[in-house]
């Protein structure tokens, strides 16, 4: 039994109910919108974030309709942000499959992302919980600011760990934090419990993103990420930052210049950074 199946066991029925509710958001009478929504739905991931939310709710109490609508809202927000991010990053792939903007075009992708974002607002309204609504609204602001920070860093090419941590805190960890906290809130957990859930979610999200960035330097059909893709797009992740800041080798100095000039290729990236992956793995522990 794989690790995700083990994690799902305590919430199997609840997760099935979530999936039904989530999938119900991806239908529309308009032909084009229905087609694109179906495409997005079929490319869906493992729903790790809703699992975290449901597990937190069950840990502190019961999974209710408030929990389910919260989980759907957060997963929809995550989905819409990925569609918009692919447009901004000009990415042709998402999870090893053609992105929405690649399969259709940027205009369609932006509008479908907006439609899903509006569906977030509809679903979170069904929680009738002001704290959850406010938390989700603030999360949307944080995700957008994180994407802008990453764009700014791509332009400025500042090779600094603190900026990297701030980007992944806003773009990834904030969503894990929200899932953990809102899961606890939906179960009427105490303020102290919600604070602990937030901290757990934040740390889990940071670890998740650092490990995901490591995968960028290895071929993997399972995760659908080409080797060195982030660096080729100008995104300076932790393996790159550490390598560039902790060596005097001429080869690495040349690599740094190519990164800033945007002339790096994936073979050069892989060869130069393999030795530094162990350092990054240690930072997740």
PLM regions and their residue ranges:
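All-alpha prenyltransferase/terpene-synthase fold signal
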Residues: 1-285
């Amino acid at each position: 039994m794989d690790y995700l199946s083990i994690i799902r066991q305590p919430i199997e029925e609840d997760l099935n109910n979530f999936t039904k509710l989530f999938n119900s958001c991806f239908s529309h009478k308009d032909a084009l919108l229905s087609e694109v929504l179906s495409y997005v739905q079929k490319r869906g991931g493992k729903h790790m974030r809703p699992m975290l939310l449901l597990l937190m709710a069950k840990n502190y109490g019961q999974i209710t309709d408030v929990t389910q609508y919260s989980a759907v809202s957060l997963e929809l927000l995550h989905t819409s942000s990925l569609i918009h991010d692919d447009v901004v990053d000009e990415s042709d792939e998402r999870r090893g499959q053609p992105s929405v903007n690649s399969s259709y075009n940027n205009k369609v992708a932006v509008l479908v992302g907006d439609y899903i974002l509006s569906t977030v607002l509809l679903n979170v309204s069904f929680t009738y919980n002001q704290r959850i609504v406010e938390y989700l609204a603030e999360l949307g602001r944080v995700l957008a600011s994180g994407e802008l920070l990453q764009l700014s860093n791509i332009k400025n090419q500042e090779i600094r760990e603190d900026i990297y941590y701030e980007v992944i805190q806003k773009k990834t960890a904030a969503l894990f934090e929200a899932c953990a906290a809102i899961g606890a809130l939906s179960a009427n957990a105490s303020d102290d419990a919600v604070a602990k859930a937030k901290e757990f979610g934040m740390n889990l999200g940071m670890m998740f993103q650092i490990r995901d960035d490591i995968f960028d330097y290895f071929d993997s059909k399972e995760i659908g990420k080409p080797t060195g893709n982030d660096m080729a797009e100008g995104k300076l992740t932790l393996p790159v930052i550490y390598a560039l800041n902790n060596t005097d080798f001429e080869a690495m100095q040349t690599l740094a210049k190519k990164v800033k000039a945007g002339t790096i290729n994936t073979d050069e990236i892989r060869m130069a950074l393999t030795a530094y992956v162990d350092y990054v793995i240690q930072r997740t522990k």
